[in-house]
Amino acid sequence: MSGARDALERLIEARAAEKEQTLFYRALAGDAEAAGDAELAERLNGLLADEQHHLSRLTARLLELGVTLPPLDEVEAPATALADWEEAARERERQEVRRYESVPRAQLDERTAEVLEEILEAERHHVTALGGKWMNA
């Protein structure tokens, strides 16, 4: 597999992972709202907003590059538990950082590399702060 093709395949995989991440935070935010914890729900909704933004940016960039994208209908929400959400979320965010760091940059065009770096920066903030609103509109 060529370097460019490998990089695009990894971004397609990252797109599916971002979809899963949105489902993860959406479920947790709903649980927090049901538990009456408005502050936690807001925090989780901030993370959800960032992950949705990552998904949108990856989708848009891949489509701009002419990539035919697989549907995301089959991506399922992972199991969630509000009681230990921070530990699970931090590990999931670490996985996202590792995923984006592993994408070979040398074969990416400048704009795609910029999008990747912006997402990676937000994911690094998520690991340390577990809060959202790190993405620029």
Task: Please provide the spans of the model-predicted regions.
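Non-heme di-metal
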Residues: 1-137
